């Protein structure tokens, strides 16, 4: 199966530092491992500190499936991620 790199940009309702505490928490790290998602990068925009970029890698279709699940979306929104602002692009290396 192909490996996809997925790039998310979105707004947050809290500070980047507070959002990172949740994103880097043991619970979220375990969730990523359980579903087969490898976070590669997370950062905030220089021009807008409430805009975040996250890059994940996983087998083809995994990220799309996981992040379209209504239960996962509820958990994501608890972190301060404003899900309705999410823009997603998917990339393949070959």
Residue spans of the language-model regions?
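Short S/T/G/P-rich N-terminal loop/turn motif that feeds into the first structured element of a domain
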Residues: 1-73, 82-94
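Short, exposed beta-strand-loop hairpins at the edges of beta-sheets
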Residues: 77-79
